[in-house]
Curated annotation (Swiss-Prot):
Name assigned to this protein: Exocyst complex component 2
Organism: Drosophila melanogaster
Classification via Gene3D superfamilies: Immunoglobulins (2.60.40.10)
Disulfide bridge map: none
InterPro entries assigned: EXOC2/Sec5 (IPR029175), EXOC2/Sec5_N_dom (IPR039481), Ig-like_fold (IPR013783), Ig_E-set (IPR014756), IPT_dom (IPR002909)
Name of the gene encoding the protein in the UniProt record: Sec5
GO terms (BP aspect): anterograde axonal protein transport; border follicle cell migration; branch fusion, open tracheal system; cellularization; endocytic recycling; exocytosis; Golgi to plasma membrane protein transport; Golgi to plasma membrane transport
GO CC entries: annulate lamellae; axon cytoplasm; cell cortex; clathrin-coated vesicle; cytoplasm; exocyst; neuromuscular junction; plasma membrane
Length: 894
């Protein structure tokens, strides 16, 4: 029940009857019909009430008088309360003033003169004390009515109070003036006490008017006597008696007609007892056409109960006619029960009516002419067949559309959903709406509400449901799993979706998450039905397949984007963990995180009753591994393409001998120092690619594994190790390419520079400094060192070790080819070889050490003690002179 009405505001708070008041408050009714009562000062004002809102009512006051509450009564809240009051008062009404209530029309008495006046005193009233009130301000104190509750200050009223009058009109008048006014009033009263003659003089006009009126009355009476005679009252009496006699005749006639009506009513009542039976044949037909089968069942049951055992021939004949009509209605009902489409409630209503009619006609000759074994089961079979037919019809419609639209696929708007997507949406809508209806109808059948005379068939119904769900999943597989092998599915189902063009397939793939969402919505609807697990497992398997397929599609799309990362390479060195690496791996990491976010939101996040795709040794885990391998392999190929594609576009400059007239190429200070990728040389790109490979192998790829773990995936060890192996292979190939590019020209200059100017080792020569070929070899190595160090110091050791090994091998070969060394030639060769070996000691591996040893041992004849001492002195002096040049080779772990 709603709260009681409460009146909290009123405007105005006082007034005469008929005052229009605005009532405000709370819970004053929910609508106009809810307001059933309104009392103001105890007077009912409902007729004048105008409901505006639950907080506002407008009404007019009644004829009440005094202070009182405003009580609002509503249907919802009952009788209410009021926190404010209204003061009703009656004001003096003149002959020309409208009034909302009936007033006393007798002339008011002028108490000042002691007799009634002919005219209203209010029109000519002056101050009875004879005092001027022009300067006085009339005030009515708030407590004036409380002081005189039953009085007023009006001279014309019976309850006139002199004290009220004085307080109201002469509040500021002095006492002396009041005494003077009293004297004036006394003189005025004395002057009115004159004789009849003076009264007639003062009222001569009124007396003459009264005499004229009496003369007019006398004339009218005389005219009536002439017209009707002296016995006017007898004529009136006769008319009244005639009216009485005529009224008695009319009343007697009414009584006679009433008796006839009662007798007719009795006859009709007697006939109406059996009218139901006689009208029943037409009634059941009319009700059946209107679909009111409940009424048909009730009427037929009532007729059977009333007249089923009668022996009256006419009744038996009518009952037989009714039975034939009911038999025809049963046939119509059975046809309607199996006719689709229709709602479960409608089908349930028809089945109940059909079962009731069959039970009432069972055991009778007419009932045996039509025997419906089990109408509820027939309805279930009809609904199951209609569901399968709807699936197939929808499939055929969309496949035919797809077959005819293949030529237009290239011009299709990418924002327009492909036909496969529309098919998935429509098929899921059908399953979500019709499968629950089939299940509910089956539950009504097996719980006994619609059960017929035969035992239920739960096994058959289960097969119906499973078959419908399997067909549903088959159609979705044919439409969604477009890139999978469907030969077995086509052979088992005999169905196939038309093979579209590559562009149509490409347009459909981004819509697969939408198809997954449609399937999940239908699956959630079926879960709420409490279907058996066997049925739900069929759809769960399909959803897991679609989820995995969706994952594969998203990662393939990411792999395609990864293959295009090479165009985003700016050759900007911004990796703190591994100097020389560019921002390309960071772009790959961003792409991978975006892909994992999309996968997580679209397909990998499990919903109600969905499987875990990442179970150990599952297809999902294998798919994740395979897609990640493809993703990382594509990235490795991007780096390789950047390196070797650059090699094809540019003609790299080689470090050749300055002694032969070909200066070394000038290298920029840094990769990004020239302001863009166009200024990056081939050597710098090769070094950046090598650094990227090394960074991916040591740091970046393991970090990607941590990202997968953070997203809830198992650590993809196999994919990461495979990618690292691939990266190592590519690193080795790229390293060999770079070493060959830098080392072969350097080594090739040693022999020409060594024998420049017809130099021979067996001739005596001036010693004391390094030979030009050794100087040039050191300079070239410093140049290579500088180039590598400016990009990625971590690549110094693997690159320089290979180049130094090649140099040592070349020196060993050249020294072994010398037949004989002169005294000074042996010292010079010893100094040159030892300087190169000692200065490059940090980048000399075991093979290079052996080659340097072979080169020293090839000096023939071997050095004597004096030669060794001389060679040591020269070597120390040369090292001091070249200490700044050789200082870079002495830095460990640059």
């Amino acid at each position: 029940m709603a709260p009681q009405p409460v009146v909290t505001g009123l405007s105005p708070k006082e007034g005469p009857p008929g005052t229009r008041v605005i009532i405000r408050g709370e819970f004053l009714g929910t609508r106009v019909q809810d307001l059933i009562g309104l009392k103001i000062c105890g007077s009912d004002c409902l007729l004048s009430a105008e409901w505006k809102s639950p907080n506002k009512i407008i009404a007019r006051t009644g004829p009440a008088k005094g202070k009182g509450d405003i009580i609002v009564t509503t249907l919802s809240g009952g009788v209410g309360t009021s926190t404010v009051q209204f003061r009703a008062y009656h004001e003096t009404i003149g002959p020309l003033k409208e009034s909302a209530v009936w007033i006393e029309e007798s002339p008011s008495q002028n108490f000042a003169w002691g007799r009634r006046t002919l005219a209203q005193s209010g029109l000519t009233q002056e101050d009875p004390l004879g005092l001027s009130i022009e300067g006085n301000e009339q005030k009515i104190p708030e407590d004036l009515r409380d002081l005189f509750p039953e009085a007023c200050g009006d001279l014309s009223q019976e309850h006139f109070s002199p004290a009220w009058f004085l307080l109201e009109n002469h509040l500021a008048t002095s006492f002396e003036d009041l005494k003077a006014g009293l004297s004036y009033l006394k003189r005025k009263v004395e002057s009115q006490k004159e004789g009849q003659l003076s009264f007639l003089k003062s009222n001569a006009g009124s007396v003459i008017d009264q005499l004229d009126t009496l003369m007019n009355i006398r004339d009218k009476l005389q005219e009536d006597v002439k017209l009707h005679g002296n016995e006017t009252l007898n004529i009136l009496e006769t008319s009244i008696e005639n009216s009485i006699s005529e009224s008695q005749k009319i009343f007697t006639d009414v009584l006679v007609r009433k008796e006839k009506a009662d007798s007719t009513r009795s006859v009709l009542f007697a006939l109406s007892r059996h009218k139901f039976l006689f009208c029943l044949p037409n009634s059941v037909d009319r009700r059946a056409k209107a679909g009111e089968y409940d009424i048909v069942v009730n009427d037929y049951s009532r007729a059977k109960n009333l007249f089923g055992k009668t022996e009256i021939p006419i009744f038996r004949k009518v009952l037989e006619e009714v039975d034939h009509r009911i038999l025809s209605i049963r046939k119509q009902l059975h046809e309607k029960v199996v006719k689709m489409p229709q709602s479960v409630e409608q089908q349930k209503k028809l089945i109940k009516a059909l079962i009731s009619l069959e039970l009432q006609q069972s055991g009778t000759p007419i009932g045996d002419k039509l025997r419906n074994i089990d109408p509820a089961w027939d309805a279930i079979e009809a609904r199951a067949k209609y569901l399968e037919w709807t699936f197939r019809q929808t499939f055929d419609q969309h496949t035919s559309k797809d077959s005819g639209a293949q030529e237009k696929a290239k011009n299709r708007d990418s924002s327009q959903a492909p036909n496969r997507v529309n098919f998935c949406e429509e098929l899921c809508d059908i399953a979500a709406s019709q499968l629950p209806d089939l299940w509910r109808l089956g539950q009504l059948y097996f719980t006994g509400e619609l059960r017929g005379p035969h035992d239920p068939k739960p096994g058959d119904f289960k097969r119906m449901v499973l078959n419908a769900i399997e067909k549903f999943c088959v159609y979705l597989r044919l439409a969604i799993l477009i890139a999978t092998d469907q030969r077995a599915l086509r052979q088992s189902s005999g169905l196939a979706w038309p093979i579209g063009s590559a562009s149509a397939t490409h347009q459909f793939l981004p819509w697969i998450p939408q198809c997954l969402r449609f399937t999940r919505i239908a699956y959630a609807t079926l879960i709420s039905l409490d279907l058996p697990s066997e049925a739900l497992d069929i759809i769960q398997k399909l959803i897991d397949e679609v989820r995995l397929f969706c994952f594969s599609i998203i990662f393939k799309r990411a792999t395609d984007r990864c293959k295009k990362l090479g165009s985003q390479e700016t050759w900007e060195l911004g990796v703190e963990e591994y100097p020389g690496a560019t921002l390309l791996p960071a772009a790959l990491e961003t792409l991978l995180i975006e892909t994992l976010d999309e996968v997580q939101s679209v397909c990998m996040q499990r919903e109600t009753r969905e499987g875990n795709l990442l179970e150990p040794q599952s297809d999902g885990q294998r798919e994740v591994t395979q897609r990640l391998q493809e993703f990382l392999s594509a990235f490795s190929a991007v780096i390789e393409e950047l390196a070797f594609h650059s090699h094809d576009e540019e003609t790299p400059t080689h470090n050749v001998s300055q002694l032969l007239g070909f200066p070394n190429a000038q290298q920029p200070d840094s990769v990004a120092g020239s302001g863009g990728a166009a200024a990056v040389t081939w050597e710098q790109r090769m070094l950046c690619c090598l650094a990227n490979y090394a960074y991916c192998n040591k740091i970046f790829f393991p970090r990607l594994g941590d990202i997968f773990v953070r997203y809830g995936y198992p650590l993809p060890t196999l994919a990461i190790e495979t990618a690292r192996y691939t990266v190592n292979q590519l690193f080795t190939n790229l390293l060999e390419e770079y070493v060959e590019h830098k080392g072969d020209p350097l080594v090739g200059t040693i022999e020409p520079s060594m024998y420049l100017g017809r130099f021979q080792w067996d001739h005596e020569m001036e010693i004391g400094q390094l030979r030009p070929y050794a100087h040039e070899c050191c300079d070239n190595l410093v140049g290579v060192y500088s180039e590598i160090y400016s990009i990625s110091p971590a690549l110094l050791r693997p690159i320089l070790e290979s180049i130094v090994q090649t140099i040592s091998e070349e020196l060993a070969r050249l020294m072994s080819c010398v037949q004989r060394f002169s005294f000074t030639g042996a010292i010079q060769a010893h100094v040159d070889i030892r300087l190169l070996r000692d200065s490059l000691e940090g980048y000399v591996n075991e093979t290079a050490k052996n080659y340097f040893m072979e080169a020293l041992e090839a000096i023939n004849p071997p050095l004597s003690g004096e030669q060794k001492r001389k060679a040591d002195e020269i070597l120390e002096r040369v090292k001091r002179n070249m200490r700044l040049q050789l200082l870079c080779f002495s830095v460990k772990d640059p």
